[in-house]
Amino acid sequence: MAEAGAGGLSETVTETTVTVTTEPENRSLTIKLRKRKPEKKVEWSSDTVDNEHMGRRSSKCCCIYEKPRAFGESSTESDEDEEEGCGHTHCVRGHRKGRRPTTPGPTPTTPPQPPDPSQPPPGPMQH
């Protein structure tokens, strides 16, 4: 406290210190580590068959065909004349060597049907 003598003015200074103590909170943080997902990629094994005979192991076809062999038959014997494809009905490209895919149309087992004379010919409709 400070006082001034002659003029009768006095000044009072009060300092207040507030100490707040808080109890530590019981917070916890849990971090879970997860493995990275492996990248999806094709890995060819050393015994993968190159069914397109192009010297590489990639294929635009739907599958890699391994021809079934009889018990005891050597895997090194190959008969190119008996190549028949993968047998999957969903494979529209085929797996036959030297053949290109054809445009969609009637299947070779069904002959094309002649047009029905009772039906109007296909073309633009006229009203």
Curated annotation (Swiss-Prot):
Residues 1-55, 70-127 are annotated as: Disordered. The modification Phosphoserine is found at S74, S75, S78. The modification Phosphothreonine is found at T76, T110. The modification N-acetylalanine is found at A2. InterPro entries: PPI_Ypi1. Its EC number is 2.3.2.27. Residues 11-23 have a biased composition (Low complexity). Auto-ubiquitinated. Residues 53-63 are annotated as: Atypical RING finger domain 1. Keywords: Acetylation, Phosphoprotein, Protein phosphatase inhibitor, Transferase, Ubl conjugation, Ubl conjugation pathway. Interacts with TLR2 and UBE2D2. PANTHER family: E3 UBIQUITIN-PROTEIN LIGASE PPP1R11, E3 UBIQUITIN-PROTEIN LIGASE PPP1R11-RELATED. Atypical E3 ubiquitin-protein ligase which ubiquitinates TLR2 at 'Lys-754' leading to its degradation by the proteasome. Plays a role in regulating inflammatory cytokine release and gram-positive bacterial clearance by functioning, in part, through the ubiquitination and degradation of TLR2. Inhibitor of protein phosphatase 1. This is E3 ubiquitin-protein ligase PPP1R11.
